[in-house]
């Protein structure tokens, strides 16, 4: 499978063809877990160090027949009920005054491009933060955003759900780059450690750690 088909299966509980985002093999929309839980008043978050229209994060908010339909996928943020989305910027948000940014703000969805700016957004306001990794500053967005994610989503009264993706393990696998695979895996491992620590303190949190597919055959002779 690929990230689109696997991401859709994880987000919806229904298998589909490769390259599908939130649709079945015939192109019909499938309700995702973000939509199902939001309808019950549960706070929802989608976090990734990939671009915001990457196959895995988009499977939790979009419904498109092809993973490369980046503009259409980004526009599905206008109708997604997700309370918090953090991922790297993409072409649809190339300018701060892009049409999509204006449309989101017209729907009272805040849009920011740096993680610290989230502190300026009311906890009850939906927000999209276009923040990627900054290796020059040793900034890993999935690690650095965790406490903020928990603070914002736990403000609701009916619990929360969040999907957090460490996407770059896969990117290292595609390139058969063992250093990147290990480095990104260690970053993800630190994130899981933070999540487990929170779950130990909270007592009512379920954590699932999953991979959607293997890339690069790192376990074989490609290293």
What residue ranges belong to the model's regions?
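Active-site nucleophile/metal-coordination loop of metallo-enzymes that catalyze phosphate/sulfate
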Residues: 1-68, 82
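A post-motif C-terminal structural segment
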Residues: 1-7, 54-220
